[in-house]
Amino acid sequence: MHTKDLTTGSPMKLILSFMLPLVFGLLFQQVYSMVDTIVVGKFLGVDALAGVGSTGSITFLVLGLCNGVCAGFAIPVAQKFGQRDFDGLRRFVGNMIWLSCVIAAAVTLVTTLLCRQILLWMDTPADTFSYAYDYIFVIFLGIPATMLYNLLSGILRSLGDSKTPLVFLIMCSLLNVALDIVFILTLNMGVAGAGWATLLSQLISGVLCLYFIVKKFPILHLKRDDLRLRKIYVRKLLNMGLPMGLQYSITAVGSILLQTAVNGLGATAMAAIAAGSRVSMLLVCPFDAMGTTAATFAGQNLGAGKLDRIHQGVKDCTVLGIIISAAIFVITWFGGSAMTTLFLDTADGASVDMVVPMGHQFLIINAAFAVPLLFVNLLRFTIQGLGYSEFAVFAGVFEMVARGAFGLCLVPVLGYTAACFASPAAWVMADLFLFPAYFHCMKKQGYSFKPTKVSAATE
Protein backbone atom coordinates (compact mmCIF):
# COMPACT_ATOMS: atom_id res chain seq x y z
CA MET A 1 0.00 0.00 0.00
CA HIS A 2 1.50 3.35 -1.06
CA THR A 3 -0.33 5.88 1.10
CA LYS A 4 1.50 9.07 2.10
CA ASP A 5 0.95 11.16 5.22
CA LEU A 6 1.10 14.86 4.23
CA THR A 7 0.59 16.11 7.80
CA THR A 8 4.22 15.78 8.93
CA GLY A 9 7.52 16.82 7.38
CA SER A 10 8.62 19.72 5.18
CA PRO A 11 5.64 21.07 3.18
CA MET A 12 7.81 21.95 0.17
CA LYS A 13 9.40 18.49 -0.02
CA LEU A 14 6.05 16.76 0.40
CA ILE A 15 4.39 18.99 -2.18
CA LEU A 16 7.14 18.34 -4.73
CA SER A 17 7.18 14.58 -4.15
CA PHE A 18 3.39 14.41 -4.47
CA MET A 19 3.17 16.89 -7.34
CA LEU A 20 5.84 15.52 -9.69
CA PRO A 21 4.01 12.26 -10.52
CA LEU A 22 0.89 14.33 -11.14
CA VAL A 23 2.81 16.59 -13.53
CA PHE A 24 4.10 13.61 -15.49
CA GLY A 25 0.63 12.08 -15.50
CA LEU A 26 -0.98 15.25 -16.80
CA LEU A 27 1.75 15.65 -19.40
CA PHE A 28 1.06 12.17 -20.69
CA GLN A 29 -2.66 12.89 -20.59
CA GLN A 30 -2.16 16.02 -22.64
CA VAL A 31 0.21 14.23 -24.99
CA TYR A 32 -2.34 11.59 -25.88
CA SER A 33 -4.96 14.30 -26.18
CA MET A 34 -2.60 16.19 -28.47
CA VAL A 35 -2.01 13.06 -30.54
CA ASP A 36 -5.70 13.08 -31.43
CA THR A 37 -5.39 16.65 -32.61
CA ILE A 38 -2.07 16.18 -34.42
CA VAL A 39 -3.26 13.10 -36.31
CA VAL A 40 -6.57 14.78 -37.16
CA GLY A 41 -4.89 17.99 -38.33
CA LYS A 42 -2.16 16.32 -40.38
CA PHE A 43 -4.16 13.50 -41.96
CA LEU A 44 -7.76 14.74 -42.04
CA GLY A 45 -7.20 18.45 -42.71
CA VAL A 46 -7.85 21.91 -41.25
CA ASP A 47 -11.65 21.56 -41.32
CA ALA A 48 -11.44 18.36 -39.28
CA LEU A 49 -9.02 20.04 -36.85
CA ALA A 50 -11.36 23.01 -36.52
CA GLY A 51 -14.32 20.69 -35.97
CA VAL A 52 -12.61 18.72 -33.20
CA GLY A 53 -11.26 21.92 -31.67
CA SER A 54 -14.69 23.54 -31.62
CA THR A 55 -15.93 20.78 -29.28
CA GLY A 56 -13.39 21.69 -26.61
CA SER A 57 -15.62 24.06 -24.64
CA ILE A 58 -18.69 21.82 -24.57
CA THR A 59 -16.51 18.81 -23.75
CA PHE A 60 -14.97 20.81 -20.92
CA LEU A 61 -18.45 21.64 -19.64
CA VAL A 62 -19.61 18.03 -19.51
CA LEU A 63 -16.39 16.25 -18.56
CA GLY A 64 -15.51 19.10 -16.20
CA LEU A 65 -18.79 18.49 -14.38
CA CYS A 66 -18.02 14.77 -14.03
CA ASN A 67 -14.36 15.19 -13.12
CA GLY A 68 -15.15 18.01 -10.69
CA VAL A 69 -17.69 15.81 -8.93
CA CYS A 70 -15.08 13.04 -8.63
CA ALA A 71 -12.51 15.49 -7.24
CA GLY A 72 -15.04 16.79 -4.72
CA PHE A 73 -15.94 13.27 -3.65
CA ALA A 74 -12.27 12.59 -2.86
CA ILE A 75 -11.91 15.50 -0.40
CA PRO A 76 -13.85 13.87 2.49
CA VAL A 77 -11.69 10.78 1.95
CA ALA A 78 -8.54 12.90 2.39
CA GLN A 79 -10.00 14.49 5.52
CA LYS A 80 -10.89 11.10 7.03
CA PHE A 81 -7.41 9.82 6.18
CA GLY A 82 -5.91 12.81 7.98
CA GLN A 83 -8.10 12.01 11.00
CA ARG A 84 -7.17 8.30 10.76
CA ASP A 85 -10.89 7.44 10.70
CA PHE A 86 -10.68 4.49 8.30
CA ASP A 87 -14.21 3.23 8.93
CA GLY A 88 -15.61 6.60 7.92
CA LEU A 89 -13.25 6.64 4.94
CA ARG A 90 -14.63 3.35 3.61
CA ARG A 91 -18.22 4.49 4.09
CA PHE A 92 -17.52 7.58 2.03
CA VAL A 93 -16.02 5.40 -0.71
CA GLY A 94 -19.02 3.07 -0.66
CA ASN A 95 -21.51 5.92 -0.93
CA MET A 96 -19.57 7.69 -3.68
CA ILE A 97 -19.70 4.52 -5.82
CA TRP A 98 -23.50 4.65 -5.92
CA LEU A 99 -23.62 8.39 -6.54
CA SER A 100 -21.03 8.16 -9.33
CA CYS A 101 -22.97 5.43 -11.14
CA VAL A 102 -26.15 7.51 -11.10
CA ILE A 103 -24.38 10.68 -12.26
CA ALA A 104 -22.46 8.89 -15.04
CA ALA A 105 -25.60 7.24 -16.41
CA ALA A 106 -27.66 10.44 -16.32
CA VAL A 107 -25.01 12.65 -17.93
CA THR A 108 -24.24 10.10 -20.66
CA LEU A 109 -27.91 9.77 -21.58
CA VAL A 110 -28.58 13.52 -21.72
CA THR A 111 -25.43 14.50 -23.61
CA THR A 112 -25.61 11.81 -26.29
CA LEU A 113 -29.22 12.74 -27.00
CA LEU A 114 -28.58 16.49 -27.15
CA CYS A 115 -25.06 16.81 -28.61
CA ARG A 116 -26.28 17.55 -32.17
CA GLN A 117 -28.59 20.29 -30.93
CA ILE A 118 -25.85 21.75 -28.75
CA LEU A 119 -23.54 22.08 -31.76
CA LEU A 120 -26.35 23.85 -33.63
CA TRP A 121 -26.83 26.27 -30.74
CA MET A 122 -23.09 27.03 -30.92
CA ASP A 123 -23.36 28.02 -34.60
CA THR A 124 -20.84 25.37 -35.61
CA PRO A 125 -20.04 26.03 -39.31
CA ALA A 126 -21.46 23.58 -41.84
CA ASP A 127 -18.01 22.64 -43.17
CA THR A 128 -16.87 21.48 -39.71
CA PHE A 129 -20.19 20.29 -38.22
CA SER A 130 -19.96 16.61 -39.16
CA TYR A 131 -16.42 16.36 -37.80
CA ALA A 132 -17.46 17.97 -34.52
CA TYR A 133 -20.49 15.71 -34.12
CA ASP A 134 -18.69 12.46 -34.94
CA TYR A 135 -16.00 13.21 -32.38
CA ILE A 136 -18.07 14.57 -29.50
CA PHE A 137 -20.71 11.83 -29.66
CA VAL A 138 -18.09 9.15 -29.00
CA ILE A 139 -16.48 11.21 -26.22
CA PHE A 140 -19.87 11.50 -24.49
CA LEU A 141 -20.40 7.75 -24.79
CA GLY A 142 -17.19 7.32 -22.82
CA ILE A 143 -18.29 9.38 -19.80
CA PRO A 144 -18.64 6.30 -17.54
CA ALA A 145 -15.07 5.25 -18.40
CA THR A 146 -13.80 8.77 -17.70
CA MET A 147 -15.56 8.88 -14.33
CA LEU A 148 -14.28 5.42 -13.39
CA TYR A 149 -10.65 6.43 -13.80
CA ASN A 150 -11.04 9.88 -12.22
CA LEU A 151 -12.95 8.54 -9.23
CA LEU A 152 -10.43 5.80 -8.47
CA SER A 153 -7.36 7.95 -9.08
CA GLY A 154 -8.89 10.69 -6.91
CA ILE A 155 -9.33 8.21 -4.05
CA LEU A 156 -5.72 7.05 -4.36
CA ARG A 157 -4.43 10.63 -4.38
CA SER A 158 -6.50 11.49 -1.32
CA LEU A 159 -4.54 8.74 0.45
CA GLY A 160 -1.29 10.36 -0.66
CA ASP A 161 -0.56 7.98 -3.56
CA SER A 162 0.04 10.00 -6.72
CA LYS A 163 2.36 7.44 -8.34
CA THR A 164 -0.03 4.55 -8.99
CA PRO A 165 -2.44 6.61 -11.14
CA LEU A 166 0.60 7.83 -13.09
CA VAL A 167 1.66 4.30 -14.02
CA PHE A 168 -1.76 3.44 -15.42
CA LEU A 169 -2.06 6.78 -17.16
CA ILE A 170 1.25 6.24 -18.97
CA MET A 171 0.03 2.84 -20.14
CA CYS A 172 -3.24 4.44 -21.20
CA SER A 173 -1.41 7.17 -23.12
CA LEU A 174 0.73 4.75 -25.08
CA LEU A 175 -2.33 2.68 -25.91
CA ASN A 176 -4.16 5.80 -27.06
CA VAL A 177 -1.37 6.66 -29.48
CA ALA A 178 -1.42 3.15 -30.94
CA LEU A 179 -5.21 3.13 -31.29
CA ASP A 180 -5.17 6.56 -32.94
CA ILE A 181 -2.88 5.27 -35.63
CA VAL A 182 -4.89 2.08 -36.13
CA PHE A 183 -8.35 3.67 -36.13
CA ILE A 184 -7.55 6.75 -38.22
CA LEU A 185 -4.75 5.69 -40.55
CA THR A 186 -5.42 1.96 -40.94
CA LEU A 187 -9.18 1.58 -40.47
CA ASN A 188 -10.05 5.02 -41.91
CA MET A 189 -12.54 5.76 -39.11
CA GLY A 190 -12.04 9.54 -39.38
CA VAL A 191 -12.41 11.81 -36.35
CA ALA A 192 -14.66 9.22 -34.68
CA GLY A 193 -11.59 6.98 -34.54
CA ALA A 194 -9.82 9.56 -32.38
CA GLY A 195 -12.79 9.54 -30.02
CA TRP A 196 -12.89 5.75 -29.81
CA ALA A 197 -9.15 5.63 -29.13
CA THR A 198 -9.60 8.00 -26.19
CA LEU A 199 -12.65 6.11 -24.85
CA LEU A 200 -11.04 2.67 -24.92
CA SER A 201 -7.73 3.82 -23.45
CA GLN A 202 -9.50 5.55 -20.53
CA LEU A 203 -11.64 2.49 -19.89
CA ILE A 204 -8.61 0.21 -19.73
CA SER A 205 -6.82 2.65 -17.42
CA GLY A 206 -9.81 2.72 -15.06
CA VAL A 207 -10.16 -1.07 -14.98
CA LEU A 208 -6.45 -1.50 -14.22
CA CYS A 209 -6.69 1.07 -11.44
CA LEU A 210 -9.63 -0.84 -9.92
CA TYR A 211 -7.73 -4.12 -10.09
CA PHE A 212 -4.72 -2.58 -8.34
CA ILE A 213 -6.89 -1.13 -5.55
CA VAL A 214 -8.49 -4.51 -4.90
CA LYS A 215 -5.10 -6.23 -4.76
CA LYS A 216 -2.91 -3.67 -2.96
CA PHE A 217 -5.09 -1.40 -0.79
CA PRO A 218 -6.71 -3.33 2.08
CA ILE A 219 -7.70 0.00 3.61
CA LEU A 220 -10.19 0.31 0.73
CA HIS A 221 -11.65 -3.19 0.95
CA LEU A 222 -15.35 -2.52 1.46
CA LYS A 223 -17.79 -4.56 3.51
CA ARG A 224 -21.49 -4.85 2.77
CA ASP A 225 -22.25 -2.26 5.45
CA ASP A 226 -19.87 0.24 3.80
CA LEU A 227 -22.01 0.16 0.65
CA ARG A 228 -25.18 1.12 2.51
CA LEU A 229 -26.39 4.59 1.57
CA ARG A 230 -26.28 6.93 4.55
CA LYS A 231 -27.90 10.34 4.45
CA ILE A 232 -25.08 12.11 6.28
CA TYR A 233 -22.44 10.70 3.91
CA VAL A 234 -24.50 11.33 0.77
CA ARG A 235 -25.14 14.91 1.87
CA LYS A 236 -21.45 15.52 2.58
CA LEU A 237 -20.39 14.05 -0.77
CA LEU A 238 -22.95 16.07 -2.72
CA ASN A 239 -22.05 19.23 -0.79
CA MET A 240 -18.42 18.76 -1.88
CA GLY A 241 -18.85 17.18 -5.31
CA LEU A 242 -21.66 19.17 -6.91
CA PRO A 243 -20.15 22.63 -6.27
CA MET A 244 -16.83 21.49 -7.74
CA GLY A 245 -18.58 20.01 -10.75
CA LEU A 246 -20.70 23.12 -11.20
CA GLN A 247 -17.60 25.27 -10.93
CA TYR A 248 -16.12 23.62 -14.03
CA SER A 249 -19.44 23.72 -15.86
CA ILE A 250 -20.09 27.37 -15.08
CA THR A 251 -16.59 28.23 -16.26
CA ALA A 252 -17.25 26.23 -19.42
CA VAL A 253 -20.42 28.22 -20.17
CA GLY A 254 -18.20 31.25 -20.68
CA SER A 255 -15.93 29.16 -22.89
CA ILE A 256 -18.92 28.07 -24.98
CA LEU A 257 -20.00 31.68 -25.47
CA LEU A 258 -16.44 32.51 -26.49
CA GLN A 259 -16.21 29.51 -28.84
CA THR A 260 -19.50 30.52 -30.44
CA ALA A 261 -18.00 33.91 -31.22
CA VAL A 262 -14.77 32.32 -32.51
CA ASN A 263 -16.81 30.06 -34.80
CA GLY A 264 -17.99 33.22 -36.52
CA LEU A 265 -14.37 34.12 -37.37
CA GLY A 266 -13.96 31.12 -39.70
CA ALA A 267 -12.03 27.86 -39.87
CA THR A 268 -8.57 29.51 -39.79
CA ALA A 269 -9.19 31.25 -36.47
CA MET A 270 -10.86 28.12 -35.11
CA ALA A 271 -7.86 25.98 -36.07
CA ALA A 272 -5.39 28.50 -34.59
CA ILE A 273 -7.16 28.55 -31.23
CA ALA A 274 -7.62 24.76 -31.30
CA ALA A 275 -3.89 24.22 -31.82
CA GLY A 276 -2.89 27.01 -29.43
CA SER A 277 -5.19 25.70 -26.71
CA ARG A 278 -3.71 22.22 -26.95
CA VAL A 279 -0.17 23.58 -26.57
CA SER A 280 -1.24 25.86 -23.73
CA MET A 281 -2.88 23.00 -21.83
CA LEU A 282 0.35 21.05 -22.11
CA LEU A 283 2.46 23.91 -20.76
CA VAL A 284 0.23 24.62 -17.75
CA CYS A 285 0.10 20.99 -16.58
CA PRO A 286 2.25 21.91 -13.53
CA PHE A 287 -0.48 24.31 -12.38
CA ASP A 288 -3.15 21.64 -12.71
CA ALA A 289 -0.96 19.24 -10.72
CA MET A 290 -0.35 21.93 -8.12
CA GLY A 291 -4.09 22.41 -7.70
CA THR A 292 -4.71 18.71 -7.09
CA THR A 293 -1.77 18.63 -4.67
CA ALA A 294 -3.09 21.68 -2.81
CA ALA A 295 -6.53 20.11 -2.34
CA THR A 296 -5.08 16.87 -0.95
CA PHE A 297 -2.54 18.70 1.21
CA ALA A 298 -5.21 21.02 2.64
CA GLY A 299 -7.68 18.17 3.16
CA GLN A 300 -5.28 15.95 5.10
CA ASN A 301 -3.91 18.79 7.22
CA LEU A 302 -7.37 20.13 7.96
CA GLY A 303 -8.30 16.67 9.22
CA ALA A 304 -5.18 16.72 11.41
CA GLY A 305 -5.95 20.26 12.64
CA LYS A 306 -2.72 21.75 11.21
CA LEU A 307 -3.83 24.99 9.55
CA ASP A 308 -0.35 26.52 9.79
CA ARG A 309 0.96 23.85 7.42
CA ILE A 310 -1.78 24.66 4.91
CA HIS A 311 -0.75 28.32 4.73
CA GLN A 312 2.93 27.40 4.52
CA GLY A 313 2.06 25.08 1.65
CA VAL A 314 0.34 27.94 -0.18
CA LYS A 315 3.42 30.13 0.22
CA ASP A 316 5.75 27.38 -0.98
CA CYS A 317 3.54 26.70 -4.01
CA THR A 318 3.52 30.41 -4.85
CA VAL A 319 7.31 30.54 -5.08
CA LEU A 320 7.40 27.37 -7.15
CA GLY A 321 4.58 28.59 -9.40
CA ILE A 322 6.26 31.90 -10.21
CA ILE A 323 9.38 30.05 -11.37
CA ILE A 324 7.21 27.78 -13.54
CA SER A 325 5.39 30.82 -14.98
CA ALA A 326 8.67 32.34 -16.14
CA ALA A 327 9.67 29.06 -17.78
CA ILE A 328 6.31 28.83 -19.58
CA PHE A 329 6.74 32.29 -21.06
CA VAL A 330 10.29 31.58 -22.28
CA ILE A 331 9.25 28.28 -23.88
CA THR A 332 6.26 29.92 -25.55
CA TRP A 333 8.23 32.89 -26.84
CA PHE A 334 10.92 30.81 -28.50
CA GLY A 335 9.05 27.59 -29.31
CA GLY A 336 5.40 28.53 -29.70
CA SER A 337 5.42 28.62 -33.50
CA ALA A 338 7.13 25.25 -33.79
CA MET A 339 4.68 23.66 -31.36
CA THR A 340 1.71 25.10 -33.26
CA THR A 341 3.07 23.67 -36.53
CA LEU A 342 2.85 20.15 -35.06
CA PHE A 343 -0.92 20.25 -35.50
CA LEU A 344 -0.92 21.20 -39.17
CA ASP A 345 -0.30 19.53 -42.50
CA THR A 346 2.93 21.22 -43.59
CA ALA A 347 2.16 20.32 -47.21
CA ASP A 348 -0.72 22.79 -47.04
CA GLY A 349 1.48 25.87 -47.10
CA ALA A 350 -1.33 28.41 -47.21
CA SER A 351 -2.99 27.02 -44.09
CA VAL A 352 0.29 26.86 -42.18
CA ASP A 353 1.22 30.43 -43.09
CA MET A 354 -2.11 31.71 -41.74
CA VAL A 355 -2.67 29.48 -38.72
CA VAL A 356 0.81 29.39 -37.15
CA PRO A 357 1.22 33.16 -36.51
CA MET A 358 -2.29 33.31 -35.07
CA GLY A 359 -1.65 30.29 -32.86
CA HIS A 360 1.63 31.78 -31.63
CA GLN A 361 -0.11 35.06 -30.81
CA PHE A 362 -2.65 33.15 -28.72
CA LEU A 363 0.13 31.33 -26.84
CA ILE A 364 2.17 34.47 -26.10
CA ILE A 365 -0.80 36.37 -24.69
CA ASN A 366 -1.88 33.47 -22.49
CA ALA A 367 1.66 32.78 -21.26
CA ALA A 368 2.04 36.43 -20.22
CA PHE A 369 -0.78 35.84 -17.72
CA ALA A 370 0.52 32.57 -16.27
CA VAL A 371 0.80 33.95 -12.73
CA PRO A 372 -2.93 34.77 -12.45
CA LEU A 373 -3.64 31.23 -13.69
CA LEU A 374 -1.29 29.89 -11.00
CA PHE A 375 -3.39 31.50 -8.27
CA VAL A 376 -6.66 30.34 -9.83
CA ASN A 377 -5.51 26.74 -9.40
CA LEU A 378 -3.67 27.11 -6.11
CA LEU A 379 -6.26 29.11 -4.17
CA ARG A 380 -9.33 27.46 -5.63
CA PHE A 381 -8.19 23.94 -4.79
CA THR A 382 -6.88 24.92 -1.36
CA ILE A 383 -10.28 26.40 -0.55
CA GLN A 384 -11.92 23.19 -1.74
CA GLY A 385 -9.59 21.12 0.42
CA LEU A 386 -10.69 23.24 3.38
CA GLY A 387 -14.25 22.13 2.69
CA TYR A 388 -15.67 25.29 1.09
CA SER A 389 -16.56 23.97 -2.35
CA GLU A 390 -19.32 26.55 -2.78
CA PHE A 391 -16.65 29.23 -3.21
CA ALA A 392 -15.42 27.39 -6.30
CA VAL A 393 -18.81 28.04 -7.88
CA PHE A 394 -18.47 31.79 -7.33
CA ALA A 395 -14.96 31.76 -8.81
CA GLY A 396 -16.38 29.95 -11.83
CA VAL A 397 -19.05 32.64 -12.18
CA PHE A 398 -16.36 35.32 -12.36
CA GLU A 399 -14.58 33.37 -15.11
CA MET A 400 -17.82 32.81 -16.98
CA VAL A 401 -18.72 36.50 -16.92
CA ALA A 402 -15.29 37.51 -18.26
CA ARG A 403 -15.21 34.97 -21.09
CA GLY A 404 -18.84 35.58 -21.93
CA ALA A 405 -18.30 39.34 -22.10
CA PHE A 406 -15.37 38.91 -24.46
CA GLY A 407 -17.29 36.44 -26.61
CA LEU A 408 -20.51 38.42 -26.84
CA CYS A 409 -19.17 41.97 -26.86
CA LEU A 410 -15.50 42.19 -27.84
CA VAL A 411 -14.78 39.39 -30.32
CA PRO A 412 -17.44 40.61 -32.80
CA VAL A 413 -15.84 44.08 -32.68
CA LEU A 414 -12.11 43.46 -32.16
CA GLY A 415 -11.89 40.01 -33.73
CA TYR A 416 -9.24 37.38 -33.05
CA THR A 417 -7.10 39.43 -30.64
CA ALA A 418 -10.03 39.79 -28.25
CA ALA A 419 -10.45 36.01 -28.27
CA CYS A 420 -6.80 35.64 -27.24
CA PHE A 421 -7.30 37.89 -24.20
CA ALA A 422 -10.51 36.20 -23.01
CA SER A 423 -8.95 33.53 -20.79
CA PRO A 424 -6.39 35.87 -19.18
CA ALA A 425 -9.22 38.25 -18.33
CA ALA A 426 -11.15 35.34 -16.80
CA TRP A 427 -8.18 34.35 -14.62
CA VAL A 428 -7.72 37.88 -13.32
CA MET A 429 -11.43 38.17 -12.54
CA ALA A 430 -11.40 34.87 -10.64
CA ASP A 431 -8.36 35.95 -8.60
CA LEU A 432 -10.17 39.10 -7.50
CA PHE A 433 -12.60 36.77 -5.73
CA LEU A 434 -10.27 33.94 -4.69
CA PHE A 435 -7.74 35.97 -2.69
CA PRO A 436 -10.25 37.38 -0.17
CA ALA A 437 -12.09 34.04 -0.19
CA TYR A 438 -8.93 32.17 0.84
CA PHE A 439 -8.23 34.49 3.77
CA HIS A 440 -11.88 34.32 4.82
CA CYS A 441 -11.93 30.50 4.78
CA MET A 442 -8.70 30.18 6.75
CA LYS A 443 -9.89 32.65 9.38
CA LYS A 444 -13.23 30.85 9.59
CA GLN A 445 -11.33 27.66 10.40
CA GLY A 446 -9.61 29.52 13.24
CA TYR A 447 -6.28 30.40 11.64
CA SER A 448 -4.55 33.67 12.53
CA PHE A 449 -2.37 35.30 9.88
CA LYS A 450 -0.03 36.78 12.48
CA PRO A 451 3.67 35.90 11.92
CA THR A 452 4.60 32.44 13.24
CA LYS A 453 7.85 30.55 13.57
CA VAL A 454 8.90 28.55 10.52
CA SER A 455 9.22 25.42 12.63
CA ALA A 456 5.53 25.55 13.45
CA ALA A 457 4.70 24.94 9.81
CA THR A 458 7.14 22.17 9.25
CA GLU A 459 7.14 20.11 12.40
Question: Positions of the model-derived regions?
Answer:
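Helix-terminus/linker motif at the lipid-water interface of multi-pass membrane proteins
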Residues: L27, V31-L49, L119-A126, V182-M189, ...
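Transmembrane helical elements of multi-pass membrane transporters/channels
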Residues: S17-D36, V138, Y149, C172, ...
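Short alpha-helical transmembrane segments in multi-pass integral membrane proteins
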Residues: M1-M19, V77-G142, T186-L242, A298-F369, ...
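N-terminal transmembrane alpha-helices
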Residues: L6-F43, S57-G72, P76, C101-T108, ...
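Short runs within selected transmembrane alpha-helices of multi-pass transporters and secretion channels
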Residues: C70, I139-R157, P165-S173, A194-V207, ...
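Interfacial/gating helices of multi-pass transporter permease domains
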Residues: V40-F60, A126-Y131, V191-A192, Y233-M240, ...
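Hydrophobic transmembrane alpha-helices of multi-pass small-molecule transporters
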Residues: L61-G64, T108, N176-D180, G206-L210, ...
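Small-residue-rich hydrophobic transmembrane alpha-helices
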Residues: L49-L109, T146-P165, A272-G336, L373-G387, ...
